[in-house]
């Protein structure tokens, strides 16, 4: 069965050429919220970037990495593949097959006890939780999650603020539970009262102002961006300024890494019947285009699900600044994280 699915993914792969602020608003009452001011960066001859086709692929859902060999892990059509910087793909972990669920997002472990390059994926069917997919393709359950609601976000803490654990969000109506999981599968609840969030979570680097080390999470319904602290407080960073609403609002997040050779990648999944039906491609923005748009290392990129309009958030001692930096195809349907590959 995997062979047929892998062949479908690889046959669908074809190389393609690569190319609001709010002030002092407070988050909904959770008993754990504060406020943060934002401002808008003045445009200084900056050129907005554009998401273009990096590679065609069947049913892409999420991208994560890079791994130590420079490849990006792609979740597509219920399986995993590895994307090389030139856009070529090869199957990975034939034993892994998503048991179902609309959005079983993934992340790749940094060096440490989780195992460098090991993939962790949300499992949305019983037993619900997180599965571990080793670098040699073996699959086992890491943790079973019992909090009520939809498991809808996953991100590694690479800063140490959360003890270098894996963070998972579970949404139940207007409230979100955040669980921290260690490499042995032990679970600690960070909060059960965070605001509603969903999608491509990211933990902020230390350079991200007062929010360094916090879990950054968007809410596609309202369009706002929250920071969730290791102590469980939810702080409003600001409004993204992107269109918001179900299947429209800000969905994907990723921090631009140091090094200056980053190419941003984002899954654009075909979703028939949606206002943004998608393209079944992985979209990309090259490093030169990011630089021309004023994006630099340490910035947070946030892309909307409908049309992949993209903001950059930059936080420092003086506060946070939010600015539109990229546009995408109007029909695009962004999903999962924004990952960064070695630029072509």
Language-model-detected regions and their locations in the chain:
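C-terminal motif of bacterial Sec signal peptides marking the signal peptidase cleavage site
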Residues: 16-17
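Sequence/structural signature of beta-propeller domains
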Residues: 38-344
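Bacterial N-terminal signal peptides that target proteins for export
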Residues: 1-7
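…; additionally, a secondary subgroup of soluble metalloenzymes is captured
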Residues: 10
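N-terminal low-complexity, Pro/Thr-rich disordered segments
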Residues: 20-46
